[in-house]
């Protein structure tokens, strides 16, 4: 089956987001009998029981995922730029670019920061045996990174979600009816996490653990809309299929 260069780039981005999901599970998922208690804002007692290899692989998934994330979202931006040519539409394309470039720059760092915070807590406790002191040190590391983390969240997750919802309901994306637009409105990190992710938390273990990957899955679903856009653009002759 023939596959366009554009389609392969979008799929590469989806693979990158899938690596994010795997990394999120490795970092945050807990066993049925593990403690769900937290110390301070971000430190979970369960980190003490987690194998170090989980954090190492999680960081690797974050780094590799970021490279593939850029490939996919850069391709979707190029499609949007080609498809949306009116001045009022172009401002949303620009905001989409700001959002995905923020993600490219920051998500690898953010992912590594969270996992390193867990490792600092784990290793400090193993060395000195003081859980409260270890948690205090780890939380201080988080607080030092809180400002860029919040900025990344606003400029990528929030902005990307707003842009996608606007594009959907202003009919900038080729969706055929209201039902498709309602379904597509879930295809972003904020709505998918806020609704679907929170619903998973109500389920018994291990289904409740699915919540940990829903933010990254929301980014993956944005690229799924990119595949829909590419398909319709090819039908209309807006972009020619490139076969290698």
Describe each region flagged by the PLM.
Residues 1-243:
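Hydrophobic, aromatic-enriched alpha-helical segments typical of multi-pass transmembrane helices
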């Amino acid at each position: 089956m023939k596959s366009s260069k554009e389609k392969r780039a979008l799929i590469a981005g989806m693979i990158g987001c899938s690596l994010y999901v795997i990394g999120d599970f490795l970092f945050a998922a807990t066993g049925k009998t593990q403690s769900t208690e937290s110390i301070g804002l971000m430190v979970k007692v369960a980190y003490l029981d987690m194998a170090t290899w989980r954090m190492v692989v999680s960081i690797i998934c974050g780094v590799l995922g970021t490279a593939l994330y850029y490939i996919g979202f850069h391709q979707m931006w190029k499609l949007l730029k080609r498809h949306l040519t009116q001045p009022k539409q172009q401002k949303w394309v620009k905001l989409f670019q700001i959002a995905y470039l923020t993600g490219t720059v920051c998500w690898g760092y953010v992912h590594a920061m969270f996992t390193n915070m867990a490792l600092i807590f784990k290793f400090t406790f193993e060395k000195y045996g003081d859980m409260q002191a270890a948690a205090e040190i780890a939380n201080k590391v988080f607080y030092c990174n809180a400002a860029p983390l919040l900025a990344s969240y606003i400029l990528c997750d929030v902005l990307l979600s707003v842009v996608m919802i606007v594009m959907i309901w202003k009919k900038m994306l080729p969706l055929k009816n209201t039902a498709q637009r309602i379904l597509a409105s879930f295809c972003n990190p904020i709505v998918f996490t806020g609704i679907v992710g929170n619903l998973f938390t109500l389920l018994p273990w291990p289904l409740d653990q699915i919540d940990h990957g829903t933010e990254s899955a929301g980014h993956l679903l944005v690229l799924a809309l990119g595949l829909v856009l590419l398909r319709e653009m090819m039908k209309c002759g807006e972009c020619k299929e490139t076969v290698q």
